[in-house]
């Protein structure tokens, strides 16, 4: 790396100083202050604040910065509630599915088939399932269906999907979650939409549901299905079914927490649906 010419005026022996200091200088978007050889350098961050960092501190600073850059690579974060523009950017950068294509659409199968699928377990996927009675009657079913179509099941303080997002095969969208301080944007794509309409027979069942697969940039790899069902006994059930595994360093080390959050979401999501039926 070439030593900047303007630095020679401050220290004739500067070319023998550690290269890490030069790296740090080039990475800072601000004005250079002055050197205090041989232990520290001073520079402006922005245009106001003066910072003095020793060579050893500079090394730690760079190592920490590289570590943060590594663990946040391809994670879509926002300190404020994500705007439509941020969500669109997340979707545009997300690319393709991040889980095995042989499992695409697998959540459309009955729950029993998913739980008995040894291949899923062998490939490291864990299953999350919740089925809750939310009422009875065709009117309740229709209200539940409308709630899903308008993403009311994501109408939470800490989680949301743009309610204008159409539920159709191939549609990409973001699930926005607030985790501690930042919001995290999770890109997904609808892989199927299934609806069984009620026949003229009074006791016939009806159901509506859709499944979404995770895209690159999502902390997990897998698929999730949301559905509402009117059974033969005229009872209405809301169901969440997913299989997933960590797709990033952060979700890997915090997977027990992720699993708890999945169960918590299922509970909160059910309450959100109940408000609309």
What residues fall within each predicted segment?
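A conserved amphipathic terminal alpha-helix motif
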Residues: 87, 246-277
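Hydrophobic-ligand binding "helix-grip"
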Residues: 180-232
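Beta-strand/loop substructures that line and gate deep hydrophobic ligand-binding cavities in soluble
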Residues: 214-260
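Intrinsically disordered, low-complexity segments enriched in serine/threonine/proline/glycine
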Residues: 35-38, 51
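Intrinsic disorder
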Residues: 4, 40-43, 47
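N-terminal mitochondrial targeting presequence
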Residues: 46-49, 55
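Hydrophobic ligand-binding cavity/cleft-lining segments
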Residues: 2-33, 54-180
């Amino acid at each position: 790396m070439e030593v900047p010419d303007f630095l020679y005026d401050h220290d004739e022996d500067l070319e023998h100083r550690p290269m890490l200091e030069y790296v740090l200088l080039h990475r800072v978007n601000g004005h250079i202050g002055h050197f205090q050889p041989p232990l520290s350098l001073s520079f402006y961050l922005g245009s106001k604040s003066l910072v003095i960092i020793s060579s050893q501190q500079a090394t730690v600073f760079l190592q920490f910065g590289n570590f943060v850059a590594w663990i946040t690579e391809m994670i879509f974060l926002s300190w404020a509630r994500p705007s439509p523009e941020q969500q669109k950017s997340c979707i545009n950068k997300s690319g393709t599915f991040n889980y095995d294509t042989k499992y695409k659409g697998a959540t459309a199968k009955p729950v029993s088939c998913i739980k008995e699928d040894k291949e899923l377990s062998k490939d490291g996927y864990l299953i999350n399932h919740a089925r809750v009675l939310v009422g009875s009657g065709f009117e309740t079913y229709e209200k539940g269906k409308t709630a899903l179509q308008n993403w009311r099941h994501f109408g939470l303080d800490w989680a949301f999907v743009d309610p204008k997002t159409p539920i159709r095969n191939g549609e990409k969208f973001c699930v926005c979650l607030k985790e501690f301080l930042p919001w995290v944007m999770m890109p997904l794509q609808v892989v199927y939409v299934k609806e069984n309409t009620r026949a003229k027979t009074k006791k016939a069942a009806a159901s509506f549901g859709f499944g979404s697969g995770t895209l690159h940039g999502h902390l997990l790899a897998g698929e999730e299905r949301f559905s509402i069902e009117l059974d033969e006994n005229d009872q209405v059930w809301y169901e969440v079914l997913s299989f997933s595994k960590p797709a990033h360093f952060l979700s890997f080390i915090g997977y027990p927490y992720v699993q708890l959050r999945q169960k918590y979401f299922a509970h909160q999501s059910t309450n959100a649906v109940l408000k609309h039926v």
